[in-house]
Amino acid sequence: MFRGVATVSLDSKNRLVVPARYRDALLVNGAGRVVVTADPGQCLLLYPLPEWEPIEKKLTALSDFNPRTRSLKQLLVGYAHDIDMDSAGRVLLPPMLRKFAELDKNVVLVGQGSKVELWNEARWEAQVAQALSFSQEALPSELEGFTL
């Protein structure tokens, strides 16, 4: 289970040093094998391989005749990269994925249960500002009656 927010720096070889709290879960859940892919929100998604496999199976079963599902499948499956975390807990992010998410030196990691989102720092701050600007009336119906 991934939760919490952390800001980390890419090293000179564009490797992401995975924080210990996420690293331990990746080692337990996937033996350090991860899948990193693009997200429509212009961030990256990092999954332990066993978490990604059923998602990929569902995505590839979707029809290519619906342009919207085909586009989503092209994005999520097309950008997916299998990556092995090294012994120091680093993940080498492919140039195509770094470019897609506009990742530079500082990367924000956001735990989201079964996955971790990787954000450009400025884009993450804008995302948080947008989330804070929602009014109660604008909440989706799924959240009605939800309390913290």
Curated annotation (Swiss-Prot):
One annotated GO molecular function: transcription cis-regulatory region binding
A GO CC term attached to the entry: cytoplasm
Chief location category: cytoplasm
Gene Ontology biological process: negative regulation of DNA-templated transcription initiation
Cellular compartments annotated: Cytoplasm, Nucleoid
SpoVT-AbrB domain location: 5-51, 80-123
Top-level taxon of origin: Bacteria
Family: Belongs to the MraZ family.
UniProt cross-references to HAMAP family, sorted A to Z: MraZ
Protein name stated in the entry: Transcriptional regulator MraZ
Organism: Thiobacillus denitrificans (strain ATCC 25259 / T1)
The gene coding this protein: mraZ
